[in-house]
UniProtKB/Swiss-Prot annotation:
GO terms for biological process: gluconeogenesis; glucose 6-phosphate metabolic process; glycolytic process. The lineage of its organism: Bacteria, Pseudomonadati, Pseudomonadota, Gammaproteobacteria, Pasteurellales. Disulfide bonds: none annotated. The gene is pgi. Keywords: Cytoplasm, Gluconeogenesis, Glycolysis, Isomerase. Its main location: cytoplasm. Belongs to the GPI family. Its EC number is 5.3.1.9. It comes from Actinobacillus pleuropneumoniae serotype 5b (strain L20). This is Glucose-6-phosphate isomerase.
Length: 546
């Protein structure tokens, strides 16, 4: 990948000047009755992305596309797909796209085609899923598996949990449970719900040394052995998603039930790999394959569609415009689908761990904004929580509204009411409500303007708040796969233009290092004085209270 400071490009300078045009969303619509037709894109007639309610015009998009070209987006995209080691700080390729490469076109890393290994793991996952789901796999007392606990953290938890929740209408009889936090409460509450005779535990850790995951895995192992008192039972109730065969065998897991992945799979992009075994178990392997197919279709779109028609690139460029030129610091992901209640949390990690960097690819601090703060909750819940600030606060918060046209649960008029709110919110954010409209409403209600003059300013909405509307025909494994891949590629595009490395995460290391130093200090009653006064005081109070 090239090392290009975006702020030194001609396009960046032109965008800085263009910012002075102070584009206004209501005015842009007033000037162009066909604005929607020009500012939306459609993916396979299943996902419609409307970006017309942003403060952009044709000039904005042309300059943003010029910025992408000047920053070498096209060559960076090919570098990723072709297996070049674009994760330079860890000297790794970035090939989550190969995991869902349904075409089987060879993908080379260091001259070796990775697809035979990818397909071998998928075949192994399929066979395992069929045995568990059919009931032919038996636990230590001869009973079939009814519950699956996935123990992992970060990408080994967030992705599988998000997808199994999002696709709950497709789930089979297996009950899925997810444990991530090293807080003993998390695993204790899950173990209360399950029977050791009929429970399968998946331990998801590439190295099989991750502190949180292995602490929880050992607790689950002790729980099983407390019931059966026979170490051979571990092999019938545990499987590993790992690459460390030695540690897996030492734990008591049969390495035949170890599902591998590779160092070119980043944790937050790993649900497509063996880490997705819990997804395949919950939904059935054919639905897992459909998820992969949807992502692969979006990969093909991203790789081949011209920049003017490219959905992930367009979303990425608009995001850069909003953050670096219009001053937005956050992005809200607002799915109007209760099944997608973990979608924002998933891409909170996906975006903030990828692009939350202050050092450019040249090793120097950047002078521009990089990744935004990403957050959100499902609609309509959020409307009664934080939308107040989005509508009338002093922060500019671009929002992505996501909704399915078809619901899995056609109960009464629930879905029509849900979608009426979905459509209304983006209209309200874009167009607001003027002082004149507020006054006219009071008059229509029979009020005397003199009597309500004091209240009028509080009912004004300025509008001009940017949103994208993403309307999905129906949330299926295919469309969810495409939707996830769309956001993955958006993050990639922004990282390329920000001139940062999106696929490392050194920011998680310092806290872990310090925690490893502090842990031994907590295992005695001695007063601590080895840290700053704040940390010493907190540790000593903890010791006094425990």
């Amino acid at each position: 990948m090239q090392n290009i400071n975006p702020t030194q490009t001609a396009a960046w300078s032109a965008l800085e000047q263009h910012k002075a045009d102070n584009l206004n969303i209501p005015q842009l619509f007033a000037e162009d009755a066909n604005r929607f037709d020009k500012y939306h894109l459609n993916f396979e007639q299943q996902i419609l992305v409307d970006f017309s309610k942003n403060a952009i015009n044709q000039k904005t998009l042309e300059l943003l596309r010029q910025l992408a070209n000047e920053c070498g987006l096209a060559s960076a995209t090919e570098a990723m797909f072709s297996g070049q080691k674009i994760n330079r700080t860890e000297n790794r390729a970035v090939l989550h796209t190969a995991l869902r490469n349904r075409s089987n076109t060879p993908v080379l890393v260091d001259g070796k085609d990775v697809m035979p290994e990818v397909n071998a793991v998928l075949a192994k996952m399929k066979d395992f899923c069929e045995r568990i789901i059919s009931g032919s796999w038996k636990g230590y007392t001869g009973k079939a598996i009814t519950d699956v606990i996935n123990i992992g953290i970060g990408g080994s938890d967030l992705g599988p949990y998000m997808v199994t929740e999002a696709l709950r209408p497709y789930k089979n009889h297996l009950n899925m449970h997810f444990v991530s936090n090293v807080d003993g409460t998390h695993i204790a509450e899950v173990l209360k719900k399950v029977n050791p005779e009929t429970t399968l535990v998946l331990v998801a850790s590439k190295t099989f040394t991750t502190q949180e995951t292995m602490t929880n895995a050992l607790t689950a192992r002790e729980w099983l052995l407390a019931a059966v008192k026979d170490e051979s039972a571990v092999a019938k109730h545990f499987a590993a998603l790992s690459t460390n065969a030695k540690e897996v065998a030492k734990f008591g897991i049969d390495t035949a039930n170890m599902f591998e992945f590779w160092d070119w799979v980043g944790g937050r992009y790993s649900l497509w790999s063996a880490i997705g075994l819990s997804i395949a178990l919950s939904l059935g392997f054919e639905n897992f394959e459909a998820l992969l197919s949807g992502a692969h279709a979006m990969d093909n779109h991203f790789r081949t569609a011209p920049i003017e028609k490219n959905i992930p690139t367009t979303l990425a460029l608009i995001g850069i415009w909003n953050s670096n030129f219009l001053g937005a610091e956050t992005e809200a992901l607002l799915p109007y689908d209760q099944y997608l209640h973990r979608f924002a949390a998933y891409f909170q990690q996906g975006n903030m761990e990828s692009n939350g960097k202050f050092v450019g690819r040249d090793g120097s601090p950047v002078t521009h904004q990089t990744g935004p703060i990403v957050w959100g909750e499902p609609g309509t819940n959020g409307q009664h929580a934080f939308y107040q600030l989005i509508h009338q606060g002093t922060k500019l918060i671009p929002c992505d509204f996501i909704a399915p046209a078809q619901t899995h649960n056609p109960v009464g008029d629930h879905h029509a009411k849900l979608l009426s709110n979905f459509f209304a919110q983006t209209e309200a954010l874009a167009f607001g409500k003027s002082k004149e409209t507020v006054e006219a409403e009071f008059v229509a209600a029979g009020k005397n303007l003199a009597d309500v003059a004091e209240i009028v300013p509080f009912k004004v909405f300025t509008g001009n708040k940017p949103t994208n509307s993403i309307l999905v025909q129906k949330i299926t494994p295919f469309t969810l796969g495409a939707l996830i891949a769309m956001y993955e590629h958006k993050i990639f595009v922004q990282g390329v233009i920000f001139n940062i490395y999106s696929f490392d995460q050194w920011g998680v290391e310092l806290g872990k290092q310090l925690a490893n130093r502090i842990l031994p200090e907590l295992q005695n009653a001695e007063k601590i004085s080895s840290h700053d006064s704040s940390t010493n005081g907190l540790i000593n109070q903890f010791k006094a209270w425990r």
